[in-house]
Regions:
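Catalytic phosphate/metal-binding cores of nucleic-acid and nucleotide-processing enzymes, i.e., regions
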Residues: 1-114
Length: 114
């Protein structure tokens, strides 16, 4: 498969496998909103704030850790995602963008998360 044809969902699955294999305590976070109910019981549910990373939790040392997954070609951070990643890192946590499971593993190792 050509890199430009790899969707973000494949990257998310690869990173999820790395998280499971290493035992790091990160969970998948979905952002956005959806509607439940009908008529007068119809409600909008917001799942997470804009900029929340795809995986968030804590590393083996107890530090806050977040991974944002992007397609290898063409995946771009939103302003809210960039701000959140920068803010987490500035406050002593670990946050980064991964374009593959291999890249996520390398970043986790280099940053002392495992």
């Amino acid at each position: 498969m050509d890199l430009k044809d790899i969707p973000e969902s494949v990257v998310i699955d690869e990173v999820k496998a790395i998280i499971k294999a290493t035992g790091i305590k990160l969970q998948r976070i979905n952002t956005g909103c959806f509607v439940i109910g009908t008529g007068r019981k119809r409600r909008f549910i917001k799942t997470a704030d804009a900029g929340t990373c795809d995986f968030e939790g804590y590393d083996m040392r107890g530090r806050f850790c977040a991974i944002e997954c992007k397609r290898p070609v063409g995946g771009k951070l939103s302003a809210a995602q960039k701000w959140r990643i920068d803010d987490i890192n500035a406050k002593g946590g670990v946050a980064f963008v991964a374009h593959s499971g291999e890249e996520a593993l390398k970043q986790l190792q280099e940053r002392g998360c495992l």
